[in-house]
Amino acid sequence: MQTLAQHLTSQAVNDSLSHLILTLADTSKAISHAVRHGALAGVLGATEQENVQGETQKKLDIITNDMLKDALKADGTVRGLASEEEDHVVEVSQNGQYLVCFDPLDGSSNIDINSLVGTIFSVLPAPAGELTETSFLQSGRAQLAAGYVLYGPSTMLALTTGQGVQLFTLHPETNEFLLTNAAMSISPDTQEFAINMSNQRFWEAPMQTYIADLLLGKIGPREKSFNMRWIAAMVGDVHRVLSRGGIFTYPTDNKDPKKPYKLRLMYEANPMAFLVEQAGGKASTGYETILDITPTHIHQRVAVILGSSNEVDACLSYHGIDYSEEPNIE
């Protein structure tokens, strides 16, 4: 089996980007170690702090954020970083070539129940000149690499550099990420959907109707039965979609009129959309392709509908949109 380093060489990924990806991977090994120790290391539970999103931070949110910050500051290739746990962008190195956006611990509410969590990251080119928030406001099409690390029964890294999606598994004895799936592919059709049904009454009418039709199964207009899955961590739900197909959605809702969207564009939706498109799926807000959005600020939120291409098209048809054409992933 190829190691991650060997794979990056085989794909002719340039040395500086390879170095950055390996730094992210090595840091995820340390995060995996911290997650595994859990209560034994006293890292479970919440703090009294809130992040810029107004969410109470878990202890591991802060620990993993600091681990990634420290590693990226030492890497030498990074110009700046943006994190879910940082109010503002962080300048790293004047000579850095890359910007890194990340969610250090997606699904951290699952930590205390020993369920799936992960790290999501996106790598962008660093523009010339002074580093400001505007430096980061590039569409998802500009991403040079993206991926996630899933901390589950085994630790797995899903990665794209624009050459498909590869899956690596962390060997528990050698501590190396080894290539275990060279070409992840999302089946175009599915009978699985993932959504937080507790918000049903707050959704827009198109999503209400779409889900209602799925629930009708064989007697409804879709004429087949669907199963619902929900992990409550985007990283886990998207991993399932990449592994066996499906549709994942966190749609617009009016539960809190000031926050109609849940997921963050720069370090959740964009990297996941890049992975999904590279694996043959599609990713949309319901009204526009996620990777085509020009961000307005680093913590911008969007609605997310992604997964099996034909099922995403079916969902979008309820929104009055025809996305039957293949996405442009050049």
UniProtKB/Swiss-Prot annotation:
Q: How is the cofactor bound?
A: Binds 2 magnesium ions per subunit.
What's the main place this protein lives? cytoplasm
Write down the chemical reaction(s) this protein catalyses. Answer: beta-D-fructose 1,6-bisphosphate + H2O = beta-D-fructose 6-phosphate + phosphate
Gene3D superfamilies under this entry? 3.40.190.80, Fructose-1,6-Bisphosphatase, subunit A, domain 1
* Pfam families noted in UniProt: FBPase (PF00316), FBPase_C (PF18913)
Tree of life domain:
Bacteria
> Which cellular component appears as one GO term in the record?
cytosol
Q: Name one GO molecular function term.
A: magnesium ion binding
The residues the record assigns to binding substrate are: D106, G107, S108, S109, N196, K262
Q: Cellular location of this protein? A: Cytoplasm
Q: Which CDD domains match?
A: FBPase
Q: Which residues are noted in the entry as Mg(2+) 1-binding?
A: E84, D103, L105
Q: What EC number(s) has UniProt assigned to this enzyme?
A: 3.1.3.11
Tell me its cofactors.
Answer: Mg(2+)
Specify which residues bind Mg(2+) 2 according to the UniProt entry for this protein. D103, D106, E268
Q: What does the entry give for GO biological process?
A: fructose 1,6-bisphosphate metabolic process; fructose 6-phosphate metabolic process; fructose metabolic process; gluconeogenesis; sucrose biosynthetic process
Family from the record: Belongs to the FBPase class 1 family.
UniProt subunit comment: Homotetramer.
What name does the UniProt record give this protein?
A: Fructose-1,6-bisphosphatase class 1
Q: Which gene encodes it?
A: fbp
